[in-house]
Regions:
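N-terminal leader/signal peptides at the extreme start of proteins
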Residues: 1-24
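General helical secondary-structure elements
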Residues: 4, 13-15, 47-51, 60, ...
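Amphipathic alpha-helical segments typified by the pilin-like N-terminal helix
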Residues: 21-61
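Short, well-structured segments within or immediately adjacent to enzyme catalytic domains
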Residues: 60, 65-354
Length: 354
């Protein structure tokens, strides 16, 4: 018979404690943070470029949609460009205050037509007030095309995806009318106060005047010298639709363009020599164009002299000048194409057209 005795001084349970792993030192944490910051610094410009490229694609799509609709309009209206057609004594509106009598200025009939479109197409403003004075062929000719497209106003395709202010106004017209956006919207003061109320229905894309100015030399629309949005007209200036077969070089003549370069790190007025943007040509092509590659343009009432000089004097809601000055002076470029519809914007300028 065997006897078993527990061994003395031998622990019955042996506990193995894991060795504590060393922690990060402060220096190591700082190194990791620096590496992350460097990676973010490298990635952010690339991500910004990707976002800008995506928005450029949307912008070009907007212009193509406008081109398709303009082409359909021309087919339905015997080759004419879209343009206001009401005249004093012939303003077929259901709104009594928009019936303009014969003998009134032609511009008042255009203002009535534009107001009629807004009242019927905008759920937000069925009682939109008739602005006066207002000449909607300048900056608002697109409303005729949107009316043809039977879309509610305002419509997203009229705003460049980088035109944040216009998108802001479109999204909350009541706040715009209340002045809630501060310096991000126009001030309702001065002669143009009532016309500024139409800004939510404006477009990032402008139509060159040759498309709607049917006047002979000496009575044509001209650029005022003190800012980029003011024009000079007289009693003999005639507005009307152009025949598209008047366009001699459709692949080289701009039909629609943004007033600013928006798809870059810095926004610039479109005539700035460093500006670049997608433009719609009369052949319906949409091409990224550099301003420096375009002709200088002309003075439509003095075709033999140099180009129209445009004074970019930004409103409070617009991009500042590139120099920080109150204004910058530039040749008018493809806003004032030499030769008008017979001219060339990108290539040798036509010199014999009047």
């Amino acid at each position: 018979m065997r006897n078993f005795y527990p061994a003395r001084n031998v622990p019955l349970h042996v506990q193995l404690r894991p060795r504590a792993s060393p922690g990060f030192t402060l220096i190591e944490l700082l190194v990791v943070m620096v590496i992350i910051a460097l990676l973010l610094a490298l990635l952010m410009p690339a991500l910004g470029s990707v976002r800008r490229a995506a928005k450029t694609t949307v912008c070009m799509s907007n212009l193509r949609q406008m081109a398709v609709s303009a082409g359909s309009y021309a087919v339905d209206f015997k080759g004419l460009s879209y343009m206001y057609s009401w005249t004093p004594g012939r303003t077929p509106s259901a709104f009594p205050d928009l019936v303009i009598p014969a003998g009134a200025p032609t511009g008042s009939a255009f203002a009535a037509q534009a107001t009629d479109i807004i009242r019927r197409r905008s759920p937000s403003e069925p009682n939109f007030a008739l602005p006066a004075p207002w000449l909607p062929p300048i900056d608002y000719s697109h409303l005729v095309l949107l009316e043809y497209m039977s879309v509610p106003l305002p419509v997203p395709i009229s705003a460049c995806p980088e035109d944040r202010n216009l998108q802001l106004w479109q999204g909350d017209i009541a706040a715009f009318n209340a002045g809630s956006f501060g310096t991000r919207q126009p001030a309702f003061t001065g002669l143009a106060m009532s016309a500024f109320r139409a800004k939510p229905y404006s477009s990032s894309y402008e139509t060159p005047p040759a498309t709607y100015d049917r006047s002979p030399v000496g009575t044509r629309l001209g650029q005022a010298g003190f800012d980029h949005y003011t024009y000079v007209v007289n009693n003999n200036t005639r507005f009307g639709p152009a025949r598209l077969d008047e366009v001699t070089f459709p692949s080289l003549k701009v039909q629609l363009h943004d007033t600013h370069q928006r798809h870059a790190r810095r926004q610039l007025f479109f005539t700035h020599p460093s500006a670049s943007q997608p433009v719609l040509h009369f052949d319906s092509s949409v091409v990224e164009r550099k301003t420096i590659d375009s002709g200088l343009g002309w003075a439509p009432n003095n075709p033999s002299i140099g180009p129209t000089i445009v004074s970019y004097t930004p409103f409070q809601y617009e991009p500042p000048t590139s120099t920080g000055a109150l204004r910058e002076l530039f040749p008018g470029r493809y806003r004032w194409t030499r030769g008008g519809l017979k001219g060339i914007d990108f290539g040798p300028e036509v010199t014999n057209a009047r």
